[in-house]
């Protein structure tokens, strides 16, 4: 079946989004054209502006339109002395929603993966090392993902922290709140047991 070249182009473009296959892209394209053209125009304008104007914070590497993101520019955050290392800007958003962290961040934009040719320089560890050398940092909280690559990356950064006399800590991983032990996989349960905490009264 032949369709409009522009429609085909739209569907192909939508497929660059994660989890969007041919059918989903087709549904989205037809919905925008058939029922929500104004929404499609807003999406196009927002996407164009975001792609052209959003860059990276020169300190933590998260997404921002400014040279420095709002978190790094906050004087209270600067005085905290803690840096939380994450793999992506999305992780910052998740941690900020908890309201439990008052320090600053450093975004790796990935993790170490020798098999894929991704080394320390590719994830900005030279810039993190510069911060450890020049800023008054008391603790680096390693919040990389609980994967083989994430653990390897955390261990590598912890070794760098030792060289600068900075405390390195790892976020806890374990049984989710409301979860049942019999449904939890062995690896997660092992992390839970290893990261157990003493109950004090």
Swiss-Prot record:
Where on the tree of life does the source sit, at the highest rank? Answer: Bacteria
Q: Which UniProt keywords apply?
A: DNA damage, DNA recombination, DNA repair, Metal-binding, Zinc, Zinc-finger
Give the InterPro entries listed for this entry: DNA_Rcmb_RecR (IPR000093), Rcmb_RecR (IPR023627), Rcmb_RecR_Znf (IPR015967), TOPRIM_dom (IPR006171), TOPRIM_RecR (IPR034137)
Gene Ontology terms, MF aspect: DNA binding; zinc ion binding
**SS bond list:** none
Q: Could you tell me which SUPFAM superfamilies the record lists for this protein?
A: Recombination protein RecR
ZnF region ranges: C4-type: 57-72
Q: Does the keyword Hydrolase apply?
A: no
SMART domains hit by this protein = TOPRIM (SM00493)
Where is each Toprim domain found? Answer: 81-176
GO terms of biological process kind: DNA recombination; DNA repair
Q: Which HAMAP family match?
A: RecR
What PANTHER family would the database entry show?
A: RECOMBINATION PROTEIN RECR
Q: What does this protein do?
A: May play a role in DNA repair. It seems to be involved in an RecBC-independent recombinational process of DNA repair. It may act with RecF and RecO.
Q: Please report which protein family the annotation says this sequence is part of.
A: Belongs to the RecR family.
Question: Which protein, by its recorded name, is this?
Answer: Recombination protein RecR
Source organism (scientific name): Photorhabdus laumondii subsp. laumondii (strain DSM 15139 / CIP 105565 / TT01) (Photorhabdus luminescens subsp. laumondii)
């Amino acid at each position: 079946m032949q369709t409009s070249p522009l429609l085909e182009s739209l569907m192909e473009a939508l497929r660059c989004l994660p989890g969007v296959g041919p059918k989903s892209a087709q549904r989205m394209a037809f919905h925008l054209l058939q029922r929500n053209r104004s929404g499609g125009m807003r999406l196009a304008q927002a996407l164009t502006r975001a792609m052209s104007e959003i860059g990276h914070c020169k300190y933590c590497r998260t997404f921002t339109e400014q040279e420095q993101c709002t978190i790094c520019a906050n004087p209270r955050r600067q005085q905290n002395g803690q840096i939380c290392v994450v793999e992506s800007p999305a992780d910052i958003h998740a941690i900020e929603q908890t309201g439990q962290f008052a320090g600053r961040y450093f975004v790796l934009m990935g993790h170490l993966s020798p098999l894929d040719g991704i080394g320390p320089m590719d994830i900005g560890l030279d810039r993190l090392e510069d911060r450890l050398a020049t800023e008054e940092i008391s603790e680096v909280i390693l919040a990389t993902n609980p994967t083989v690559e994430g653990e390897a990356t955390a261990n590598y950064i912890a070794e760098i922290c030792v060289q600068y006399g900075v405390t390195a800590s790892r976020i806890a991983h374990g049984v989710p709140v409301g979860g049942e032990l019999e449904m939890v996989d062995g690896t997660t349960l092992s992390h839970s047991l290893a990261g157990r905490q003493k109950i004090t009264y």
